[in-house]
Amino acid sequence: MNTAAQCSRRLLLAVACLVVALAGQPARADDYLFNDSHFHLTNYIQRGTDIRDYLRIMGDKIGRSTLFGIPLQQTWSYENSGDYGPTYYLQSDAPLYYYSFTDAYIAKTYLSLSPKQRERFDPMITGFNPADMYAVDHIRRVLELFPGVFTGIGEFTIHKEFVSSKVAGDIASLTDPALDRILAFAGEVGLIALIHSDIDTPFAKADTPPVYLEQMKALLRRHPGTTIIWAHMGLGRVVHPVQAQAGSDTAQRNPNQLELVEAMIDDPALRHVYFDISWDEVAKYAVASPAIIDKVVAFMNAHSDRLLFGTDNVAPTSQEAHLKVFHMWDPVWRRLTPEASENIRKNNYVRLFDAAREKVRAWEKKNVPQRQPNDKS
């Protein structure tokens, strides 16, 4: 091989090594698009994106990201679907069951990264049953087995369209003391709690109070020492934003979705509660018409310190697909004040998750026995 060819080969090798190395480096603080407060690495059959592929998907567009799987496993029942193996909960009538191994998988995946790469992720514990009084024991065991890894719990589900009724065993409830134990322990440790609970039943009629709203507010008020993020602002695929009926002649018009959330934000007893605007279904509602966009922009500009953007993507395969939900919000991003936009896309994530990291590490230092060099357990 001549000298020129050798130099060319070395140059290509150096470039390839640089590309791999840069995939794990965070984007510069001033030029990435967002931090992702709501991301699933794996799906309903526990398959997903390799963490290094996800780093490449993040690239220089995403600064940091939560990291969790799906706490529920879809059963493949031959009696129900034959040779077809469902990968999503809508593809089968067979039940879902809690899959606790997801937490070990997420921890091992995170620990496979270099310390610099780990800085970009905030793993979350999800593999517990919120209707089980022993759920707290699971969370504690995960923290003891994997100290230095987890920042929060969730996304875990209480009420969810099409899902809640499929879960094997007891039905989760906002009034279950098991859930109070979970949130109280999260507050003790400093773990952020990301909770999915629909605000209402599917296809609710206009001018009717949301079925689960008062229970949710009561739960949140019972745990002022826990940082809680209400996923999707309580919305779902067929759990539509709460609406006041146009032209209603009722004596007092019921508030709409944004007014309900705004009232919660203004409630001094709920200062510890935040809302994520993740999921493409939520984005569809937010940009449904120019009039709705106007209201959403005004709401987000006024309350940007309590909102976080997240994708709610599950096991993405490309950067283009992963960024699609972010760009669905472009009509809103363009009209937000620079401060509001930065808060929702980036700053609130950093503020909340950095604080949680610090609190959880301090709790672990105090409560998790330090292994000695000869400890082979």
Model-derived regions, located:
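Mid-to-C-terminal alpha-helical segments outside catalytic/metal-binding sites
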Residues: 4, 28-37, 46, 50-65, ...
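Bacterial N-terminal signal peptides that target proteins for export
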Residues: 2-13
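Active-site beta-loop-alpha junctions enriched in small/polar residues
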Residues: 40-42, 70-71, 126-130, 156-159, ...
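Bacterial N-terminal signal peptides
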Residues: 12-23
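Active-site gating/metal-coordination segments in enzymes
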Residues: 32, 81-201, 205-208
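An N-terminally biased module of ancient metal coordination in phosphate/nucleic-acid-related enzymes
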Residues: 29-108, 114
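Hydrophobic faces of well-ordered beta-strands that scaffold small-molecule active sites
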Residues: 35-39, 65-68, 121-125, 152-154, ...
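Catalytic pocket-lining loop regions of alpha/beta-barrel enzymes
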Residues: 167-308
